[in-house]
Amino acid sequence: MRAKEIREMTSEDLVVKCKELKEELFNLKFQLSLGQLTNTAKIREIRREIARINTILNER
């Protein structure tokens, strides 16, 4: 998701999206610890997505 798309969302939507991404990040880290995760780059993508959302929320 691009920053432009994130800026078009409402603050409430961004908070919900951030919670969903944090849950997904938790699950991916859990899978990584069990050795089940094959695409480790997904963790980095989600962390950056969360950072983008938090940055835009702080701008408001």
UniProtKB/Swiss-Prot annotation:
PROSITE patterns: RIBOSOMAL_L29. InterPro entries: Ribosomal_protein_uL29 (IPR050063), Ribosomal_uL29 (IPR001854), Ribosomal_uL29_CS (IPR018254), Ribosomal_uL29_sf (IPR036049). Keywords: Ribonucleoprotein, Ribosomal protein. The keyword Heme does not apply. The keyword Ribonucleoprotein applies. One of its GO terms (cellular component) is cytosolic large ribosomal subunit. GO terms for molecular function: structural constituent of ribosome. GO terms for biological process: translation. It holds the Pfam family Ribosomal_L29. Belongs to the universal ribosomal protein uL29 family. This is Large ribosomal subunit protein uL29. It comes from Fusobacterium nucleatum subsp. nucleatum (strain ATCC 25586 / DSM 15643 / BCRC 10681 / CIP 101130 / JCM 8532 / KCTC 2640 / LMG 13131 / VPI 4355).
